[in-house]
Amino acid sequence: MRRVVITGMGAVTPVGNNVNDMWEAVKTGKCGIGKITHFNTENSAVKLAGEVKGFDPESIVDKAELRKMDDFTIYALAAADEAVKDSAIDFGKEDTLRCGVILSSGIGGLTTIQRECLRGESKGYDRVSPHFVPMSITNMAAGHVAIRFGLHGMCTCVVTACASGTNAVGDALRQIRDGYQDVIVCGGAESCITDFGIGGFTSMHALSKAEDVNRASIPFDKERSGFVMGEGAGVLILEEYEHALKRGAKIYCEIAGYGSTCDANHVTAPLEDGSMAAQAMTEAVKDAGIKPENIDYINAHGTSTKLNDKGETNAIKKAFGEHAYKLAVSSTKSMTGHMLGASGAVEAIISALAVKNDIIPPTINYQVPDGDCDLDIVPNKARESRVDYAMSNSLGFGGHNASIVLRKVV
C-alpha cells in the first residue's frame, strides 16, 4: 500500500498569517478572537469573531486581479503559496497530470454574494459584476490554485459544511494511496464574517453573544453558549512517500487513516449519543492499521456549542472506551474561532505539528468544568508529551463526520 505524507503546509488564520506564527500562537495559548471590524455591529447581537489581521492581499494577487476574487479564494492562494514553497516542490519537473488539487469551502464567496445582491437590488440585476459567478462559486479556490501552479490532475472542491477541510485531506489521502495521483494540494478556505453571514448563524442560535473575548469561544466549558466565527485558510501538500523521498523532501508526518460517516438525522443538530461521529473515528483508526489505544491526542471539533461538545465527548467515549480518559483532547477553536470549511485543514496542520514536535495544544479560557464533557481537555496551557499518533475530528451541518489519523515518521 502506498503511504502518504505531508511535505508542505501553509495557513492564514486569526492567530497568524503563516504556519510558524500560527503555531507559536497556538503553543502559547494566544486568543485570536476580537471585536468585529469587517462591518458595523451596532445592529448585530454578535460582536466578536476571529478575523484575519494584517493580511496584505496585494502580496498574493495583483491589484487588477483582486476585484475578480472573493476573499476566501485569496486566502486559499496565500496558504497554497506558503505550502508549495515550504514543500520545495518544483512542479515544472513533475508530471502535472499526477498532481491535483482538493480544496474545500463550507460557504464559498458569501461576501461577493451579499455585495452583488445589494447591487442588483439598487441598480438592477443586469448590473451585477461580470465576475460575480466565478467569484462566488465554491470550487473557484481550487481552480485558481490549479491555474497558479499549472496542475492538470484531479481538481475538486469538497463541500460538507464544517467537515469540508478534513474531508478534503482524507479524499486526497485516498487519491494518492490508491495510485491516482502522486501529489495533491489540499485543504480549505473560508471568509464569511459579514453582517449577512453572522446574521444567518445568529438566527439559528448557533453563535455566542458573549462580549468578553475570554468567555466567548470556550469549548467544553459548562458556560459555553455557541461558537465564534473565524476565517482564513489552511493548505497541505500531500505526497506519496517514495516520491517525497526521491526528491529529498522534508516530511512532517504521515496521514495514516481516514473515516467519514453521516448521522442521517438532522440538518443542523448532531446525534446526542455521537454514534456516527464515533464510527468515523473507529474507521479512521482501522484504516491506519492501529488500535484505539495507540492514539495519543485528539484535536476535537470542539465548537463551544452545547450540543456539539457533549455529543463529541460521547462519541470519543464510544470510539475509545476506557482509553478516552487517557487521551489528551483539546479544541484549538478556543483560539482561532470556528473557521467553518477551513477549520479541518488548519486543525490538520496543528495536529501534524503536535506529532512532529511532541507538543499538545491547549483548550484556552477554560474555567467551569462540565460533567458532560469530562475528558482531559488540556486546559489553558500546552503540554509537552510524546505524540506518535494524533486524530483530528470535524463535524458539519447535514450530519457530516470526518476523522483523520496522523502518524509520526521517524
Locations of regions flagged by a protein language model:
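ACP-dependent fatty acid/polyketide chain-elongation machinery
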Residues: 1-65, 242-254, 349-364, 407-410
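Active-site-proximal alpha-helical scaffold in enzymes
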Residues: 76-89, 138-142, 146-149, 154-190, ...
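Phosphate/pyrophosphate-binding loops at sites that engage ATP/ADP/AMP, CoA/4′-phosphopantetheine
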Residues: 83-95, 244-249, 281-297, 319-323
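Acyl-CoA/ACP chain-elongation machinery
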Residues: 180-225, 258-272, 302-309, 326-376
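Conserved beta-ketoacyl condensing-enzyme motif
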Residues: 6, 22, 27-160, 189-198, ...
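Glycine-/small-residue-rich "gating" segment that lines the acyl/pantetheine channel
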Residues: 122-129, 170, 174, 190-246, ...
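Condensing-enzyme catalytic core mediating Claisen C-C bond formation in acyl metabolism
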Residues: 3-7, 30-34, 212-288, 297
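Short, well-ordered amphipathic alpha-helical segments that serve as non-catalytic structural scaffolds
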Residues: 76-87, 141, 168, 239-240, ...
